[in-house]
């Protein structure tokens, strides 16, 4: 199967750079799968796991918080606010963050920033999904 170059970049570092057969990410309209020779595309990404299929059934998963994905020729670039590989994730901290966000959303504080609590919950859920 043909391959494409994939890079996942944050403001701090290059999180992943390598060859892949497919990239699966969550855009605003749902999951999108990119394979070699895909038409050019730029799309915003939601906070969610990104899966990079490297060869056969091997896969690299990471938790990505926001950003954009650009597809040009045989290159996919993900520019993300944050991107964490499973080994970078503190599972206990992610569980605590999920619990805090869920508590905030159910208790309805008067000055609650609902969008912020929802984003925190999405980040925690993505981290926990990737760390499995």
Swiss-Prot record:
Belongs to the ATPase epsilon chain family. Transmembrane segments: none annotated. It comes from Brevibacillus brevis (strain 47 / JCM 6285 / NBRC 100599). The lineage of its organism: Bacteria, Bacillati, Bacillota, Bacilli, Bacillales. It is a peripheral membrane protein. Produces ATP from ADP in the presence of a proton gradient across the membrane. F-type ATPases have 2 components, CF(1) - the catalytic core - and CF(0) - the membrane proton channel. CF(1) has five subunits: alpha(3), beta(3), gamma(1), delta(1), epsilon(1). CF(0) has three main subunits: a, b and c. It is found in: Cell membrane. CDD domains: F1-ATPase_delta (cd12152). Its main location: membrane. GO terms for molecular function: ATP binding; proton-transporting ATP synthase activity, rotational mechanism. One of its GO terms (cellular component) is proton-transporting ATP synthase complex. Keywords: ATP synthesis, Cell membrane, CF(1), Hydrogen ion transport, Ion transport, Membrane, Transport. It comes from the Bacteria. NCBIfam families: ATP_synt_epsi, PRK00571.1-3, PRK13442.1, PRK13446.1. Disulfide bonds: none annotated. This is ATP synthase epsilon chain.
């Amino acid at each position: 199967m043909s391959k494409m170059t994939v890079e996942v970049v944050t403001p701090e570092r290059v999180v992943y750079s390598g060859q892949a057969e497919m990239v699966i990410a969550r855009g605003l309209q749902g999951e999108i799968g990119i394979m070699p020779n895909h038409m050019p595309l730029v799309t915003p990404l939601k906070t969610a796991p990104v899966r990079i299929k490297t060869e056969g059934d091997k896969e690299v998963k990471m938790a990505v918080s926001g950003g954009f994905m650009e597809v040009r020729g045989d290159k996919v670039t993900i520019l993300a606010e944050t991107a964490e590989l499973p080994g970078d994730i503190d599972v206990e901290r992610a569980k605590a963050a999920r619990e805090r966000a869920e508590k905030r959303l159910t208790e309805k504080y008067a000055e609650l920033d609902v969008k912020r609590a929802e984003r925190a919950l999405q980040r925690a859920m993505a981290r926990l999904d990737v760390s499995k």
